[in-house]
């Protein structure tokens, strides 16, 4: 039988990493299981160079920097980390739970699920032959390689606006959105309007023009009208959000609300001993932000500790007095 852990955290993104660190502060024996080949979740994989604006105390923190800081913080302690393992099933037993993954079985007294939105895949640009062009992108790995280029960004949410503002500093940038209004943070929208980014609204992409495997022009059409324009470009970035899949979550016996795990004020799920934090969980008034998830993590940990050791207080000493 495998070693028994106090808390096993399913998910190695920002919330999972901080939950693991905080659990060590409570003297818990901790394990992290993640389906990805590296820690960090979406910030590390999808937007390592994007600025993250909702982490208190930082104004120019990138996804990669956030990940590295959280990993360095966690390295203060010894943590069992299992990567490239997909959780298939969770079964309750006498001492806690058995987690069956694609590689092994894990024994744990409690579980904290911090898997974000689950498996994620960008929403594709649905135009003919879009997937065949090498200069059509869904994420940015090294922004400096686009310096001096003509860049067109598609989308109207936070990611699209933030990337347009980032590209504007080094490239000739256009932003195409189907509406005159943007879904991004108001501050970012005001910054966009004051920038040199060429804003094309309300337009949608209608045709790709290319040669030798690269897009040379994007045709855009007015949403309610007959006007069309042809935009020259070197690179096209699609920011239509992501399709997420919770995979086997529906088979774990947890009460769900629209593919998210219902939790109470203790971050406890419908199964005693299993907790959830971050974007994967749902409760009335929930706001999906990294900052929110980082706050939920200690609540989940403290209640997990209390579940294991009922004589220990849910509210420990404050970290400043440890």
Swiss-Prot record:
Keyword Zinc: no
Top-rank taxon: Bacteria
Cofactor note: Binds 1 FAD per subunit.
SUPFAM superfamilies reported for this sequence: FAD/NAD(P)-binding domain (SSF51905)
GO MF term set: ferredoxin-NADP+ reductase activity; flavin adenine dinucleotide binding; NADP binding
Enzyme Commission no: 1.18.1.2
Keywords: FAD, Flavoprotein, NADP, Oxidoreductase
Cofactor requirement: FAD
Gene3D superfamilies linked to this entry: FAD/NAD(P)-binding domain (3.50.50.60)
InterPro entries, per the entry: FAD/NAD-bd_sf (IPR036188), FAD/NAD-binding_dom (IPR023753), Fd--NADP_Rdtase_type_2 (IPR022890), Ferredoxin-NADP_redctase_2 (IPR050097)
Catalytic activity: 2 reduced [2Fe-2S]-[ferredoxin] + NADP(+) + H(+) = 2 oxidized [2Fe-2S]-[ferredoxin] + NADPH
Keyword Oxidoreductase listed: yes
Binding site for FAD: 34, 42, 47, 87, 120, 279, 320
Similarity annotation: Belongs to the ferredoxin--NADP reductase type 2 family.
Subunit structure: Homodimer.
Protein name: Ferredoxin--NADP reductase
Source organism of the structure: Streptococcus gordonii (strain Challis / ATCC 35105 / BCRC 15272 / CH1 / DL1 / V288)
Organism classification: Bacteria, Bacillati, Bacillota, Bacilli, Lactobacillales
């Amino acid at each position: 039988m495998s070693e028994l852990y106090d808390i096993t955290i399913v998910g190695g993104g920002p919330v999972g990493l901080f939950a693991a660190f905080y659990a060590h502060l409570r003297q818990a024996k901790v394990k992290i299981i993640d389906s990805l080949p590296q820690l960090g979740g979406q910030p590390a994989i999808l937007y390592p160079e994007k600025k993250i604006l909702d982490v208190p105390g930082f104004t120019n923190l990138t996804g990669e920097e956030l990940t590295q800081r959280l990993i360095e913080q966690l390295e203060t302690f010894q943590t069992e980390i299992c990567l490239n393992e997909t959780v298939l099933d969770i079964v309750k037993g006498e001492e806690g739970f058995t987690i069956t993954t694609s590689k092994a079985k894990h024994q744990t007294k409690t579980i904290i699920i911090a898997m974000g939105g689950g498996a994620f895949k960008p929403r594709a640009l649905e135009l003919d032959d879009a997937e065949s062009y090498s200069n059509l992108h869904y994420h940015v790995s090294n922004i400096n390689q686009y310096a001096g280029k003509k860049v067109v960004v598609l989308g109207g949410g936070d990611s699209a606006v933030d990337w347009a503002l980032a590209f504007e500093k080094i490239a000739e940038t256009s932003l195409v959105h189907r509406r005159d209004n943007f879904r991004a943070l108001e501050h970012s929208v005001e910054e966009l309007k004051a920038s040199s980014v060429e804003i094309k609204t309300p337009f949608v992409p209608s045709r790709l023009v290319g040669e030798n495997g690269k897009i040379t022009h994007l045709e855009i059409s007015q949403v309610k009208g007959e006007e069309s324009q042809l935009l020259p470009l070197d690179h096209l970035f699609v920011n239509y959000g992501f399709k997420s899949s919770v995979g086997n979550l529906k088979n774990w016996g947890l009460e769900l609300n629209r593919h998210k795990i219902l939790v109470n004020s203790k971050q406890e799920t419908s199964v005693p001993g299993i907790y959830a934090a971050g974007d994967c969980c749902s409760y009335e008034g929930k706001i999906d932000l990294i900052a929110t998830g980082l706050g939920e993590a200690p609540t989940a940990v403290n209640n997990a500790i209390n579940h294991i050791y009922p004589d220990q207080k849910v509210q420990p000493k404050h970290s400043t007095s440890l």
